[in-house]
Amino acid sequence: RHTRSAFVTGVQTCAFPISPVRELARWLHRRGVPAYVLPTGALPRPARYVPHIYTDQELAALFAQTDRCRYCSLVPLRHLVMPVLFRTIYACGLRASEARLLRADDVDITAGVLQIRDAKGGKDRQVPVSAPLRVRLADYHAHVVGRSGGDWFFPGRARQPLTLGNVDKNFRRFLWQARIPHGGRGHGPRVHDLRHAFAVNNLRSWFARGENIGALLPVLQTYMGHSSIADTAYYLRLTAESYPHISAQVHRVIGDVVPPITAGPCHGH
């Protein structure tokens, strides 16, 4: 088992630089320099990552551990930042970079709206927040943003925004403390899966209430900043595979339009 896991990781590690290496070999070959051009398909494709949809119990355990984050003299605001950061990512379905790069002026506490700037595809959007999160953001703003003395809503070191590495490192620690197993590099669960869980849990709630899913999909698309409705429809299939008891309802909405999660390219969304 250990050998197989190591092999899969090795394939994924090697697959990424193959394209530039192949182009370099072609460039050398055109200039008369003997070079072996690695044929397409020489390496197996990396295993497709299947998003981890956190259960309600896992989310509760994860957020409980963020609340227990301790003071650190090197990053004196960490214990205040982390509980709100990860709740904001989940409750608003944000990408990690969208959250960590929020500036203080991007958060309108009075209106309860986040201004997401230069997101995936270079797009901006406004994200309304729920009433409970708005209260939490207001308290956080009063106790943290004014004290940080910087431009960032979630400040890191030296008045700079949090790095993705810092976010991931803290997230892995909270997962371990919450007893949520992690499969190692490339196998998750990941921070981005909080965004997936947001979409799936909203769809699950809409199905339970008998809402018109076809009418609400464009709303979810806009809220999450998807460039295509197909990216949003992907979550219908993910919802069905995560909660088989509503798969018949999902199938009536999408039929066979959206491919199974275990096939096709990996969706970052």
Residue ranges and their predicted role:
Residues A64-A96, K120-K123, S148:
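Basic, Lys/Arg- and aromatic-enriched nucleic-acid-binding interface segment
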Residues V33-R68, R117-K120, G156-Q160:
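Flexible interdomain linker/hinge and immediately adjacent N-terminus
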Residues I53, D118, M224-G255:
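Catalytic-site neighborhood detector that most strongly recognizes the C-terminal catalytic loop/helix
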Residues C92, S97, L101-D139, H143:
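Conserved tyrosine-mediated DNA breakage-rejoining catalytic core shared by Y-recombinases
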Residues V250-H269:
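C-terminal secondary-structure termini that scaffold catalytic or DNA-interacting sites
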